[in-house]
A protein has these predicted regions:
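Class I S-adenosyl-L-methionine-dependent methyltransferase catalytic core
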Residues: 1-134
């Protein structure tokens, strides 16, 4: 799911090269406009909110409402991601941290390119991470 048609095209090209195109359903849509969907997994790279505090909050809320396993790429300096999901009973795993190159795409970007650290989180909803009590 993405609001950028070019990103959807790249995702489809990558899925084809990996031989999984039949398992990927692209959606060109804002995550906040999506109700219940049938999916195995959500991949999310929201605005990080460095320029505008809370820019990611609607994405975090939508992920929690979808209640599906999610991989979330977010700024490594964001401390609220882990706490927000743990507070809601989700299982949270920090998978890796890596440099993330950014081109100047927004008016507030003053440099042509920069790099920042990003963390990839695996977020598992409570219904999947609850212990078996049978």
């Amino acid at each position: 799911m993405d609001v950028d048609d070019d990103a959807i095209d790249i995702m489809l090209e990558n899925a084809r090269s990996l031989g999984v195109e039949g398992k990927v359903v692209p959606m060109c849509e804002e995550i906040t406009n999506v109700g219940n969907i049938e999916a195995d997994l959500v991949l999310c790279n929201p605005p990080w909110g460095k320029q505008k505090h809370g820019a990611d909050s609607k994405f975090i809320k939508s992920i929690k409402n979808l209640c599906l396993p999610t991989y979330l790429l977010h700024s490594s300096s964001a401390r609220h991601v882990e706490a927000e999901f743990l507070r809601s009973g989700w299982q949270v795993q920090k998978l890796l941290t890596l440099p993330f190159d950014l081109g100047a795409v927004y008016p507030h970007h003053t440099r042509r390119r920069m790099s920042t650290d990003a963390t990839l989180w695996r977020l598992t909803p409570p219904w999947l991470s609850a212990p078996d009590r049978s």
